[in-house]
Amino acid sequence: MNKTVRIGTRGSKLALWQAEHVAACLQTKGLEPQIVIIDTTGDKILDQSLSKIGSKGLFTEELEEQLHAGTIDIAVHSAKDLQTHLKGGMYILAITERELVNDVLVSHKPIDTLKNNPDLIIGTSSTRRRALLRKFYPQAKMVDMRGNLQTRIRKMEEGACDAMLLAYAGMHRMGYDSLIKEKLSLEEFIPAAGQGTLAIEAASTLDKEKAAVIRAVLNDAATETAVSAERAFLRTLEGGCSIPVFALAVERDTDYLLTGGIVSLDGTKYLRKEIRFTAADAEQRGVELATVLLKDGADEILAEIKKGLSKS
């Protein structure tokens, strides 16, 4: 077996940290990783909100093209950015162990919680976070905030906003824990499907022996089961990264609990339900939960969201 593993990644500091983390893990098993930096559409277009650009493969398409061409062996994605319908011949080889999944309130100012600071100007590029803010903290003012993590923090410190809502995992990986003011409640801010973990994508042409070694090193079975249910839920709702859908599966003593839902752009309509599942029926139960929500009115909320995004 050829021990070289070419790892495709975006070029941001966070993406490189993730790729280097994967590389370090692979080195422990005698593999020889090489990191290949690839620019994506989402990295190049920074003057528009994510919802205006579109939701299909913004941060992944170019990586998949290189997988298909055989110039890289695996691609490292933030699992929440990986579209639910993969291109032909592509598959998820591994899901890494999950970090803390919470969204966090980030600021350079002496503030503590969202509740105690109702008039903050909050920066975020996520339609899910914006919609949940409108539901639970309707008095908050929001501004769109694009760019890599360092750019967004710089913009905040220069006065573009008082605080930002971001994923804990990225802040922690980049060493910005001192800027985290509050870990937001999972009762209010349920994360995006796959948040806090990495998805390792490969092409079906990858050498089977090499694929098995990579999977054995990187895959966390419990996280894979949880993310499988979350992605099945998201896929059934047809929710891309510009649709405010949330999903989180948590391992319990003998099974898992999946909580999933959708919120309208203005925060006034909110559906959320739960379902239990096991490793054997994770995808099936994710589909079932989404189907129940669609029957309960999620289809109407989705139609309203898509109409609203097309006008914005």
Swiss-Prot record:
Supply the alphabetized keyword list: Porphyrin biosynthesis, Transferase
The terms under GO molecular function for this entry are: hydroxymethylbilane synthase activity
Keyword Nucleotide-binding attached: no
- S-(dipyrrolylmethanemethyl)cysteine (modified residue): where? 241
Q: What cofactor requirement does the entry state?
A: dipyrromethane
Q: Which Enzyme Commission number(s) are listed?
A: 2.5.1.61
Q: Which domain of life is it from?
A: Bacteria
An example GO CC term for this entry is: cytoplasm
Q: What class of enzyme is it?
A: transferase
* Catalytic activity, reaction form: 4 porphobilinogen + H2O = hydroxymethylbilane + 4 NH4(+)
Keyword field contains Nucleotide-binding: no
Protein's GO biological process: protoporphyrinogen IX biosynthetic process
Q: In which pathway does it act?
A: Porphyrin-containing compound metabolism; protoporphyrin-IX biosynthesis; coproporphyrinogen-III from 5-aminolevulinate: step 2/4
Q: How is the cofactor bound?
A: Binds 1 dipyrromethane group covalently.
Functionally, this protein is described as follows: Tetrapolymerization of the monopyrrole PBG into the hydroxymethylbilane pre-uroporphyrinogen in several discrete steps.
* HAMAP family, A to Z: Porphobil_deam
Q: Which protein family is named in the record?
A: Belongs to the HMBS family.
* Miscellaneous comment as given in the Swiss-Prot or TrEMBL entry: The porphobilinogen subunits are added to the dipyrromethane group.
Question: Could you describe the subunit structure of this protein?
Answer: Monomer.
This chain belongs to the protein called Porphobilinogen deaminase
Organism expressing this protein natively: Cytophaga hutchinsonii (strain ATCC 33406 / DSM 1761 / CIP 103989 / NBRC 15051 / NCIMB 9469 / D465)
Q: Which gene encodes it?
A: hemC
